[in-house]
Curated annotation (Swiss-Prot):
Record bears the keyword Transmembrane helix: yes
KW Coiled coil (keyword) present: no
Assigned keywords, A-Z: Cell membrane, Membrane, Transmembrane, Transmembrane helix
Protein name: CASP-like protein 2D1
Species this chain originates from: Arabidopsis thaliana
Region feature Disordered, mapped onto this chain: 1-26
């Protein structure tokens, strides 16, 4: 009987202390979440603009544009999707009826984090091949012939990497929001006492 009273008292203390801390943590978390989402928009737009407007002519080799490389088209598409999603999710995160639906943010955040990872990997490979080439498959480096194109593409890739990191943080935040209402698993000693 005494153990039950102690357990009830401990549970009441935990619930009262967590109730006191809850209003503070979600609001600061919500502000961080919104700032990260809003930061994605200009970075993605800048990535798109730098990539799409990037072109350079060389009298020996001709024109080099973003649409001649399939991986850059993919990067532009992913950047556009991430900017639109970030804007819509920022607005909807302040709508009261959607805030309680943590899964509405968790699943797309996870998917976009993975898609951004593939996009960054593909764009990194392109920038690497443009800078270093691949002699085994007879792909020569092109940055000596197109220096402006390569430097602009490197900046776009850097911005795209920042967006990836923001989405990785957002996926952690949305996972915390989705799973925090659930109690942690009980240890075996607690189960034996019950």
């Amino acid at each position: 009987m005494r153990d039950n009273n102690n357990n009830n008292t401990r549970e009441e203390e935990r619930s009262s202390s967590s109730k006191q801390q809850q209003p503070q943590a979600p609001m600061s978390l919500k502000i961080i979440d919104s700032c990260l989402r809003l930061s994605v928009v200009p970075l993605s737009v800048a990535t798109i603009w730098l990539t799409v407007t990037n072109h350079e002519s060389n009298p020996d080799y001709g024109n080099l544009e973003y649409n001649s490389i399939m991986g850059l088209k993919y990067m532009v598409g992913v950047s556009a999707i991430s900017a639109i999603y970030a804007l819509l999710s920022t607005v909807s995160s302040w709508v009261t009826c959607l805030v309680s639906k943590a899964w509405l943010f968790f699943i797309p955040d996870q998917v976009l984090a993975y898609v951004m990872t593939t996009s960054v990997a593909g764009a990194t490979e392109i920038v690497y091949l443009l800078n270093k080439g691949d002699k085994i498959v007879t792909w020569s480096e092109m940055c000596s012939s197109y220096p402006h194109y390569c430097s602009k593409l490197t900046i776009a890739l850097g911005l795209h990497v920042f967006v990836l990191f923001f989405f990785l943080f957002l996926s952690v935040i949305s996972a915390y929001r989705a799973f925090s209402p659930f109690d942690p698993p009980c240890d075996s000693q607690t189960n034996n006492d019950a």
